[in-house]
Amino acid sequence: MHNGGLIMDKIDINQTEPTVKRSRLFDIFFYLFQWTWGFSVNIVGGIAYLICTKILGYKHQKFGYANIVYMPWKQGGLSMGTFIFMRADHPNKEWTYNTRIHEYGHTWQCLLLGPYYYIVIAIPSMIWCNCFQKYREKNNVSYYKLYCESWANSWGEKFSQMKRIEK
């Protein structure tokens, strides 16, 4: 089956976690850097994760080096270091599949940018998402046109070794 330039039979839309296996040493360094260099982002995400999973009881899962919490909201996704918060039970499985990969890309951006994640990624992303929706619709501009969003897609695919389904 062919869709938008990608061969669909190579994509398992039901795949819920990357199958990438890295060395134990890599794992240690990943979390060491996330929780030192990226501390200011991960501490906020970690507190939100604990509240959402331990107090509110929201469903969650591991996704590569990240933890995804499925939220009862209508929005898309939000990444805070190794913590991803995204809409639960979206009716479109392709959206859920793509959003996991995209938000995972933001996890890796945090690893690179650390405390600069807020000014380079989070703030521009929130402004683009919340203030430019009508502009994007009127001018037929993809949400992923913004540098930090296309970068998240690219890195999400690279580090999960999962391909997004193109629209």
Residue ranges and their predicted role:
Residues 1-7:
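Short, Lys/Arg-enriched N-terminal segments with co-localized hydrophobic residues
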Residues 9-11, 78-88:
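Short, charged cytosolic
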Residues 98-110:
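Active-site recognition of the HExxH zinc-binding catalytic motif
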Residues 23-58, 68-74, 118-167:
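Metalloprotease/metallohydrolase-associated module, dominated by Zn2+-dependent proteases
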Residues 57-79, 90, 94:
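N-terminal signal-anchor transmembrane helix
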Residues 9-21:
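Short, Lys/Arg-rich, polar N-terminal cytosolic tail immediately upstream
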Residues 84-100:
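Short pre-active-site segment immediately N-terminal to the catalytic Zn-binding motif
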